[in-house]
A protein has these predicted regions:
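Membrane-embedded beta-barrel scaffold of Gram-negative outer-membrane proteins
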Residues: 137, 398-406, 412-428, 608, ...
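Gram-negative outer-membrane beta-barrel transporters
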Residues: 464, 526, 530, 665-667, ...
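Structural signature of Gram-negative outer-membrane beta-barrels, strongest in the C-terminal barrel
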Residues: 334-338, 342, 456-458, 462-464, ...
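Periplasmic N-terminal accessory/gating domains of Gram-negative outer-membrane beta-barrel systems
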Residues: 100-101, 108, 138-144, 150-201, ...
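Short, acidic, small-residue-rich periplasmic hinge/interaction motif at the N-terminus
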Residues: 60-62, 66-67, 119-164
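Outer-membrane beta-barrel translocator/receptor signature
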Residues: 207-209, 221-223, 232-241, 246-315, ...
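Periplasmic-side early beta-strands and strand-to-turn transitions of outer-membrane beta-barrels
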Residues: 258, 266-267, 275, 287-386, ...
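C-terminal beta-signal and adjacent terminal beta-strands/loops
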Residues: 623, 775-784, 810-869
């Protein structure tokens, strides 16, 4: 253990963060100073012009001849536009303004003695239509380069602009704004899409149901745990609802989240942010991008430091419970060499350092609900009484490479390789003076992941699509070491009195996945398109769990450390003599293994009524891999077995529409799914809790999304999610008579209605304001569906409806933006999640010894200053 003072270590880490932040700011402001100098030159130098009314291209050539300032513009910008007569003495900026004003064009400096002319909507133009024609948003998750209005998947899309509008700074918080999706305590390991949790119905299984991709790399659970995923310098976030198994493969039976950070640019630009809010919330961020070799090599560098004291205090001493510190730095290089103009390569590097306490908003009650004193406990007091005080450090390194080569105008080759190393080291320290003498536990481990994907992307006449091969390899090591004082629970006198009992449980998991997949789109004419996809996915698991526990062997004594007890509760053993032996299996025995191969088809047919309206139907098969498990009975018997994959068969229909001459986008998707061979935990008659394919569930629903440009200054959006889930078969325990079946229950965290709504106002004079609301109807916390009748009290695990309202207002200068914001304006206090009780092996209700609640952060005010150049 490190003997340094934790405060000293934190200060040392803070200094590292600030040094990198200062470096980014230094580059940023040096480039800003250069650009300001260019702008000052354009503003102060005067020239005499004599330009007659003429075509735009000729007028700009005369402007260059007079000033020496080069003018850049894209093809089609000049068109048939003509300029006004310009005769007199003006600065370069004034002259350009007069030449371009009536042509719907504007200019901005991009380098020394260089400006770029770009298209801007004229007063009579529809700004929404112009924007959609110039730059249609591409959905990266489909891997086919399709625009949002051309995909048949149900996608909730967030841009950097929407992050600002909704006042969100964390990735998990943003995902919660998607309908039919939720995240607890901003921890993406808790993500739920259409009623399916990331770790399965009741956390059974060894794989996940929802994958998170960050710049093309699948994020491991260790990299996501505890929350704290920065949105700074993120360009786009996609929440894809419904199975993505055919194209994305493993861990995407329920959907996926695709995150893309901003790309390097050949023009110098940058940004910085200073933010402060209640509950000790602070953010210091910077980003800069520019050319290394003009039009051939560009870079982007960003850094973000965020911290919060949290909003839950420990009931024992009032100290912060759910604190969080986050530092992330990201670098990108874009290579597009002139000597090989068909090649484009992107290399990305990201390092994240997080320190977190208890789960955000976690409140533990001091007593069970059966205790009369529980009625005096109010979770909204935001005081927690946990058995153990938690603190964890997470460190994640992520490297990705994306290399594309155009063989021809029809065929493109692409290779995507990723590497991730996610490490963690934490401690649960005891908050109790006497409860089995528990001191706490230490836990540490890592997950190392490698992926490689090669695909051929083609577009030839009426055909387009991809053919790809994928390889994945992951190694995970995790160890939990529990440490307790033996004095209070040993059935015999112990000397010395501080003797320690230790239990270590290491777990090793190795995963390999290989796949071949293809996705084709055929468009026989302008009205019809047919999508066909197929994937063969092969996955293997190796698993070993070894529990090292004390065993007595006085004649083979291996340890003799005064004052330390690692050994038996046998009163005939002379302390501190002991040995350590494995409980579950010998460390030298082979790992428990299993392997599965599945075919995953999908198909869709779309009818394009016109350029603005498309109808579609689709069907697909998703899966989550099976694997091995090791279980222990109450009598310490060991069971080693395997379970099969689970499947989600989905049928969807919907439309994608642009209405009111481009001012309204209205999309809809209806779905019906059959969740088959669910992996669930079953308590069998022998006392083993095994994993079995013993569940079946039906679910259906609807997702609507709309975005309406009311005027030049006002826009609104509204999204609706509807969801119904019904468990058809779920054997919970075989020990009861008859076996307890949860048929008829709802899946946990499946509100029937979810709504998001927002409006944004931006006046031409710099003032702006906006508000967003997020509504969820009531739902059960888990599949047990325990209510007041089950608990025999006024308590229930069905959470009530809730609405979160955020608002912001500010003023935008040329380079600076000042924003004031408030989150949870209505001070909503309905918990995000709750755990009060469970079911025993017999099926009887068991009240939790320490009920816990995941509370929402109360109303909080904050302000930020953003700088761009």
């Amino acid at each position: 253990m490190n003997s340094e003072n934790p405060n000293t270590l934190k200060q040392s880490k803070d200094h590292r963060y600030l040094k990198l932040l200062y470096l980014c700011l230094l580059v940023l402001f040096s480039r800003a100073e250069s650009i300001w100098a260019q702008e000052q030159m354009l503003s102060n130098s005067e020239y005499t012009f004599s330009i007659a009314r003429s075509p735009m291209i000729e007028a700009l050539q005369q402007f260059t001849a007079t000033t020496g300032i080069q003018v850049l513009f894209e093809d089609g910008v000049s068109g048939k536009r003509e300029t006004v007569v310009l005769d007199g003495t003006y600065t370069a900026e004034q002259a350009l303004g007069l030449l371009l004003a009536d042509a719907g064009l504007s200019a901005e400096p991009v380098a020394s003695q260089t400006v770029r002319v770009t298209l801007t909507p004229r007063p009579g133009d529809d700004p929404f239509r112009v924007a959609s024609e110039i730059e249609e948003i591409i959905v990266f998750g489909t891997k086919q380069g399709l625009g949002l209005q051309r995909v048949t998947d149900s996608v909730e899309l967030f841009t950097a602009e929407r992050f600002e509008q909704e006042v969100v700074f964390d990735l998990g918080e943003a995902v919660t704004r998607a309908v039919n999706a939720s995240v607890i305590r901003n921890d993406l390991n808790t993500i739920n899409i259409r009623g399916l949790d990331r770790f399965g119905t009741d956390s059974a299984g060894v794989s996940q149901a929802i994958n998170i991709f960050i710049d093309g790399a699948p994020a491991s659970s260790n990299a996501l745990e505890g929350g704290g995923q920065s949105l700074w310098d993120i360009g786009q976030l996609e929440v894809l609802r419904g199975s993505q198994s055919t194209v994305q493969g493993r861990n995407s039976i329920a959907g996926s989240v695709v995150v893309q950070s901003k790309r390097p640019d050949y023009d110098w630009s940058g940004a910085a942010r200073l933010r402060a809010g209640e509950y000790g919330s602070r953010q210091y961020s910077a980003a800069v991008t520019g050319p290394i070799v003009d039009e051939q090599l560009a870079f982007r560098l960003s850094t973000d430091y965020q911290e919060t004291d949290g909003f839950v205090d420990l009931g024992f001493d009032g100290s912060s419970s759910d604190f969080r510190d986050l530092w992330v730095t990201r670098g990108k290089l874009l290579l597009e060499p002139e000597a090989l103009d068909a090649l484009s390569a992107m290399l990305s590097f990201e390092y994240t350092d997080r320190s977190v306490g208890a789960a955000e908003g976690a409140v533990n009650a001091p007593t069970p609900i059966s205790d009369p004193s529980f009625s005096d406990f109010d979770p909204n007091d935001l005081e927690s009484f946990p058995n153990l005080i938690r603190s964890v450090d997470y460190n994640t390194t992520r490297i990705t490479s994306d290399v594309a080569y155009d063989l021809s105008s029809e065929i493109n080759l692409r290779f995507v390789g990723t590497y991730e190393d996610a490490e963690y080291d934490g401690v649960n320290g005891s908050s109790l003076t006497s409860s089995f003498g528990q001191l706490g536990s230490f836990f540490f481990g890592f997950t190392e992941t490698l992926t490689a994907e090669f695909r051929v992307e083609f577009e030839y006449e009426k055909w387009s699509g991809i053919v790809g091969a994928y390889w994945f390899e992951s190694q995970q090591d995790a160890t939990v070491e529990a440490v307790s004082l033996i004095t209070d629970f040993a059935p015999f006198p112990v000397t010395p009195i501080d003797s320690i009992f230790s239990l270590a449980v290491p777990r090793e998991t190795d995963v390999e996945n290989a796949a071949f997949y293809t996705q084709w789109r055929y468009e026989p004419n302008q009205h019809w398109s047919i999508d066909l996809g197929l994937r063969y996915d092969d996955e293997s698991y190796d698993l070993r769990t070894v529990a090292e526990v004390p065993r007595t062997a006085p004649d083979e004594c291996l340890t003799n450390i005064p004052g330390v007890f690692v050994g038996s509760e046998d009163p005939f053993v002379s302390l501190p003599c002991s040995t350590v032996a494995p409980l579950f299996s010998n460390p030298d025995t082979p790992l428990q293994s299993d392997e599965f191969g599945v075919w995953l088809p999908r198909a869709a047919v779309s009818y394009h009524l016109n350029d603005d309206l498309t109808f579609f139907v689709s069907a697909r098969r998703g899966y989550r891999a099976g694997g091995p498990f090791i279980a222990r009975s109450d009598e310490l018997e060991v069971l080693v077995d395997t379970f099969d994959p689970e499947f989600l068969i989905s049928y969807e229909a919907g439309w994608r529409g642009i209405w009111l001459e481009g001012r309204l986008v209205l999309n809809g998707t209806a779905f019906y799914s059959e969740y088959e061979d669910q992996q669930v935990r079953v308590q069998d008659a022998r006392g083993f809790e095994r994993i079995d394919n013993a569940g079946e569930t039906s679910l259906y629903g609807l997702e609507l999304s709309s975005d309406y440009k009311v005027s030049e200054t006002l826009s609104i959006y509204a999204n609706l999610g509807y969801l119904e889930t019904s468990v058809d078969d779920f054997i919970f325990t075989e020990e009861s008579d008859p076996p307890l079946n949860l048929a008829g229950n709802e899946l946990g965290r499946s509100p029937s209605t979810s709504i998001t709504f927002g409006l944004n106002y931006a006046a031409g004079n710099g003032y702006f304001a906006g508000a967003s609301a997020n509504y969820r109807s009531s739902f059960y916390a888990d599949i047990l569906n325990l209510d007041e009748d089950d608990l025999g009290s006024g308590f229930s695990e069905r959470l009530g409806s809730s609405i979160m309202l955020n608002a912001r207002a500010g003023y935008r200068f040329d380079r600076f933006t000042i924003t004031a914001y408030v989150t949870n304006l209505l001070d909503e206090d309905e918990p995000e999640n709750v755990s009060l009780a469970g079911l025993a092996d017999s099926g009887a209700v068991e009240v939790a010894t320490r009920p816990f609640f995941n509370m929402r952060q109360p109303r909080a005010f904050g302000a930020s200053i953003d700088f761009v150049f």
